[in-house]
Amino acid sequence: MVEPFLGTWKLVSSENFEDYMKELGVNFAARNMAGLVKPTVTISVDGKMMTIRTESSFQDTKISFKLGEEFDETTADNRKVKSTITLENGSMIHVQKWLGKETTIKRKIVDEKMVVECKMNNIVSTRIYEKV
């Protein structure tokens, strides 16, 4: 059920995001810039197609996809990845794979907030968004 995720969300807190970006291989300058911004995320659905648009003063990104189907994604840090997004137990699970590496971005709704857990290897970052 995607309905709880739909709408526009603003980042209100972030924990361990720089370490996560470092694990991804994001360079120092880009990590510093990305760490300062408070992005707005809009999640929408049109039929079977979902869209996640992320907007910030650093960079805007947009992905459109069908749940459970692999798609090509260029990330904000310019990685070319194969992504798959699924719904599992009330969470939206976004898996990115590239060059033998993998990261998982898990979105879930907790107390009307969107909690985003970004994990790569043993590094976990938690980012919390409130609905606008």
Curated annotation (Swiss-Prot):
The modification Phosphoserine is found at S13, S14, S44, S91. SUPFAM superfamilies: Lipocalins (SSF50814). It comes from the Eukaryota. GO terms for biological process: long-chain fatty acid transport. GO terms for cellular component: cytosol; nucleus. GO terms for molecular function: long-chain fatty acid binding. Keywords: Cytoplasm, Lipid-binding, Phosphoprotein, Transport. Pfam families: Lipocalin. Belongs to the calycin superfamily. Fatty-acid binding protein (FABP) family. This is Fatty acid-binding protein 9.
